[in-house]
């Protein structure tokens, strides 16, 4: 038979025949024989020939080597040229393949026909197959196993053979091998799933819930129950196969190829007569999957089988995607029964973490303390609001363990310091070796001794580090062995091989347990000796540190230096804010409450309204607070309320509603706080905003949360909310200077506030703080602060600036205005100090490195270079 008509062959079979020519040319042979085709079949990636031989118990590597040996023994041409000829053996083999096609009643010659034809190939096939104990009967049995009772009716039938093996993952097999994580709790959901699966029709549960609550884990839990026999009779011995939609769609380049693959999977499930339960994770992907022009989507292929109860299928998807895809297709929706999977409580999450702890300890080779598990559940629930338990708590535990493992494998700090010191001294020694004077020789001698001591210390530390690492590795290795033995014990108990189970449990397992106890004892002795370089237990501090890295919220316990800093918070703020003792005290107390862990966890850290005339330090205090908390005064969310004077501008805070431009961008306030939940949020000049804007802030002030235009809940529980306003500033200016009128002034200001703001808004604010107008002596302190800032700018040129008391009084007088507060001082400093100084620098009167003294003469500032005459 001449292989010149590709329409007689399936795609894969024709590919192998075409490749035969290349194989012959590679080996410099001109005649195409059966061995060249055999090699081409073996070389196919994931090919059916390889699968048939593997199932027949043949080692493919050895088979490949044997074929190559045979080809290499055949005659070779020094210059084979371009043309190749069809050999007699290959021609006969293709005729036999045609015979097998007719025998099986297929439309095309397929790979399995070619493989069977080798059984009667006198030149090569019979000899090779005999070496590997194969004959036609054995090959036919394997082919029957692979293709079942399917016929070759298309040119790509190989993709439909063993389709469940190709496009699915056997969860029950993984459970048998102990490769699935234990599933703790979720009994109610698993029971409801089993109940639905036991129905006669529409026996298809769909698990719906938020991402990360454990929907896939329920399917894995069911697989584990099937393996352990803890299911009703209708599910005993069944297989649970997870369908991989990605693999099913990938590479289906021709129209109808995807449907063909899916149909093959569904046929296999149907023919199993209830022995296979299909699990489709992210089931919304089947709606519209593979639907090209004129082709049917996967959802429509599933519907008839789901309705008749021929296909038992478990789906899993999130609430949003269920609503978006499944609910729109009412016919598909009614074929599934909903099982709602809720987020577990913090207590349930702790139980789940305790169940998973051992797996993570074995994987990372560290120990995880119980307090760390509790901290992971509690802190993730409190501080990570946009994700769900138990997923976020498991991630925390996993990352904390990974971080500790990384520290164990990295060089310890003590050893690193010694290494750096040795390197430094080595460089110094090289330098001193070139000197010949007595002092250098003396120093070199001392250095050699110091270097010898350090190298001894380095050797000792290295040995200790290696010893500790070895013990930790040993503990991990023993734990892994125990894990494997436990899986073997479970397997033996399932097979009722009680002798094997007892032998493992009371022999191997107890021996491993003794080894583990000895290694643990050795490790704890090393660590309690006080000389330990490594830490191998994850604690709650590690969890708190990871939370801080994720969110920017300081959760870790206060170290002594930070405690000291917080106790002196008032003094820190007063370094920037002059006067306003009451305001600084109230703000400091709020931050101290929060960091001590005594603040209400369901409200913002604090919310204030700062009232007072312009230029008295309202915005400056907010900046000082941001600078204290984040070491950067710009690290605050600043919303200028004068930009929100129209009613519709509220959408800029929380995001535009659906259908409007900018819907996807989110709001200026919500996005900023979502990215940085631990923040100072400053609403500047709130009286300028439209009244409806404050309705948005009611939930923020009361519950510490707000829902943006996308439906996301933004958490403000770790934010300090500060609002500034000039309302009532006339009363403050009139009465604020005199303490005797303080109560009267406060009453007038509060009346003005009640006229402008609604009671439900004012009632939710923690404190309304009134900033007093500034006295002359306070202005002098502000001048000194401003001069210090000017000195920082001059420091680049190494110029020092000194002012006499008279000069400071002159600037205070020039900038004093009770109505405008401290702002005119900036202008006075600029006009009376900065401008003349700039002129002097440009003229060359002052140079880099000078000390400039400013005094007053004839009621004007005079600039002197110290030890020189006045220059301005």
From Swiss-Prot:
Stretch list, region NBD2: 562-773
Chief location bin: cytoplasm
Region described as NBD1: 162-343
Coiled coil: 394-528
Segments of this protein annotated with the region Repeat 1: 9-74
Keywords: ATP-binding, Chaperone, Coiled coil, Cytoplasm, Nucleotide-binding, Repeat, Stress response
SMART domains, A to Z: AAA, ClpB_D2-small
Residues annotated to bind ATP 1: 209-216
GO cellular component: cytoplasm
Entry-linked InterPro entries: AAA+_ATPase (IPR003593), ATPase_AAA_core (IPR003959), Chaperonin_ClpB (IPR017730), Clp_ATPase_C (IPR019489), Clp_N_dom_sf (IPR036628), Clp_R_dom (IPR004176), ClpA/B (IPR001270), ClpA/B_CS1 (IPR018368)
GO biological process, one term: protein refolding
Annotated segments matching region C-terminal: 774-872
Domain Clp R: 6-149
Domain comment in the entry: The Clp repeat (R) domain probably functions as a substrate-discriminating domain, recruiting aggregated proteins to the ClpB hexamer and/or stabilizing bound proteins. The NBD2 domain is responsible for oligomerization, whereas the NBD1 domain stabilizes the hexamer probably in an ATP-dependent manner. The movement of the coiled-coil domain is essential for ClpB ability to rescue proteins from an aggregated state, probably by pulling apart large aggregated proteins, which are bound between the coiled-coils motifs of adjacent ClpB subunits in the functional hexamer.
Annotated function: Part of a stress-induced multi-chaperone system, it is involved in the recovery of the cell from heat-induced damage, in cooperation with DnaK, DnaJ and GrpE. Acts before DnaK, in the processing of protein aggregates. Protein binding stimulates the ATPase activity; ATP hydrolysis unfolds the denatured protein aggregates, which probably helps expose new hydrophobic binding sites on the surface of ClpB-bound aggregates, contributing to the solubilization and refolding of denatured protein aggregates by DnaK.
UniProt family annotation: Belongs to the ClpA/ClpB family.
Listed name of the protein: Chaperone protein ClpB
